[in-house]
Design a protein with these regions (language model features):
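Short catalytic/ligand-gating loop segments at beta-alpha or beta-beta junctions
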Residues: 29-38, 58, 71-79
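Short glycine/serine- and small hydrophobic-enriched flexible loop segments
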Residues: 40-48
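Solvent-exposed, acidic/polar segments of extracytosolic/periplasmic ligand-binding ectodomains
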Residues: 65-127
Length: 127
């Protein structure tokens, strides 16, 4: 997980995962990065808005957000629709683990996001 926070550039995606696990005692969940990114987008929009108290100004500012953060680059200026950004996904599988948790998520396909390294081989799930 090579990405870093736009709110705290010293915080990597791996550190976010580790912090979540140490502070909650629970295994991290796949949505933690995209949930974090909601706050990154909000900060970018509120900062760019002519008046952060004006809903219309904030909504318009979202259309101009183009930043790199916890989920990589999110560009709301390019679509697929105005004000919408697409996260470049990776394919994952939960694999048996010898660590603290019984299973751990491993990246098995990075064809749409080459910045994230492959961590395991894709295995059939119906075997």
């Amino acid at each position: 997980m090579p990405n870093k926070s736009s709110l705290d550039p010293s915080l990597s995606a791996s550190q976010l995962k580790d912090n979540f696990q140490s502070q909650t005692g629970n295994q991290w969940v796949q949505s933690i990065g995209s949930t974090y990114s909601l706050f990154e987008v909000a900060k970018a929009a509120f900062t760019a808005a002519s008046d952060p108290h004006d809903k219309a100004a904030v909504a318009q500012a979202i259309h101009n957000v183009n930043y790199t953060g916890m989920c990589g680059t999110l560009d709301f200026t390019q679509g697929p629709a105005p004000g919408v950004a697409i996260i470049n996904p990776v394919g994952v599988q939960w694999k048996q683990s010898s660590g603290k948790y019984q299973f751990e998520m491993k990246v098995v396909d990075n064809s749409l996001n080459k910045n994230v390294p492959i961590g395991a081989k894709l295995e059939p799930t119906n075997a």
